[in-house]
Amino acid sequence: MSEIEKVTKTQFDNVYECIFNDGTTRLCTKNLSPGHNVYGERLIKYGGVEYREWNAFRSKLAGAIVKGLKYNPIVKGSKILYLGAASGTTPSHISDIVELQGKVYSVEFSPRVIRELLLVAQYRPNMFPILADARFPQYYKSLVENVDIVYVDIAQPNETEIAMYNARFFLKKNGYMMIAIKSRSIDVTKDPREIYNAEAKKLEDAGFDIREVLELDPYDKDHAMIVVKYK
């Protein structure tokens, strides 16, 4: 197995590149819970710090960063509402990024899947799993404070509408929303790019400022990341 040669900072807060002696480079985050991995990712020790490899094929946010994402508003201390947390792959890396000063409110609909999420969160005091349906934020509004970012990955035909509805409840003014759009969940007959543009137009018409629309191929086929600012 190749050995770590150095770790360098990226343009984004608490996101790093691990460079190995065989010339390969991998995205990584500092492990908030040393000794524990989440989805079988490699743990890398360098300079007295443990990092977790961040697999771009397992995380849409990692894929977006590798693809050249320009706007990543997630920083140390950010408060995040994550819709569609699943078993915690991407939320755990966000947990690393925001550190203990931040919070990751992690909403998941499946009782089976949230059991896995709870196992992840027990080692991460800044993660707060919530068993709920993202279509009905009124049922978890007492559990979530106003947040800096709403991150959405729920693969529903009305994902954009669900995202905007949650933003009305929880997103601070001048906060950001990041939406992972799966075009095939919206319309299998249309060209994915046409769908991305249509979803961005919905957001713009609702008063959001479009910062970026980034296609995620080859890491996630027929997906795009849309980043908007709440004016």
Curated annotation (Swiss-Prot):
One of its GO terms (biological process) is box C/D sno(s)RNA 3'-end processing. Keywords: Methyltransferase, RNA-binding, rRNA processing, Transferase, tRNA processing. Coiled coil: none annotated. Disulfide bonds: none annotated. InterPro entries: Fibrillarin, Fibrillarin_CS, SAM-dependent_MTases_sf. Signal peptide: none annotated. Its EC number is 2.1.1.-. S-adenosyl-L-methionine binds at residues 89-90, 108-109, 133-134, 153-156. GO terms for molecular function: histone H2AQ104 methyltransferase activity; RNA binding; rRNA methyltransferase activity. Interacts with nop5. Component of box C/D small ribonucleoprotein (sRNP) particles that contain rpl7ae, FlpA and nop5, plus a guide RNA. Involved in pre-rRNA and tRNA processing. Utilizes the methyl donor S-adenosyl-L-methionine to catalyze the site-specific 2'-hydroxyl methylation of ribose moieties in rRNA and tRNA. Site specificity is provided by a guide RNA that base pairs with the substrate. Methylation occurs at a characteristic distance from the sequence involved in base pairing with the guide RNA. Belongs to the methyltransferase superfamily. Fibrillarin family. This is Fibrillarin-like rRNA/tRNA 2'-O-methyltransferase. It comes from Sulfolobus acidocaldarius (strain ATCC 33909 / DSM 639 / JCM 8929 / NBRC 15157 / NCIMB 11770).
